[in-house]
Regions:
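Acidic, Ser/Thr- and proline-rich intrinsically disordered linker/docking segments
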Residues: 1-15, 19-60
Length: 60
């Protein structure tokens, strides 16, 4: 299992399994929400493109 580390907007480290990411959405102001399911969302200080690139996922 592989994990990618992010820092959320509160400065806490978040480790995400890229295979569990459901969606990535721009919040504005260079912030992005990453969802790993029902109640598992967090906000990072990255653009959506940067977050997806960090996850190593191809975009179509």
């Amino acid at each position: 299992m592989e994990f990618v580390m992010f820092e959320d907007v509160q400065g806490q480290e978040i480790y995400v399994n890229p295979e569990q990411v459901v969606w990535v959405r721009e919040l504005g102001d260079k912030r992005t929400i990453i969802s790993c399911g029902h109640d598992h969302t967090f906000t990072v200080r990255l653009s959506p493109a940067q977050a997806v690139a960090a996850l190593g996922v191809k975009v179509r």
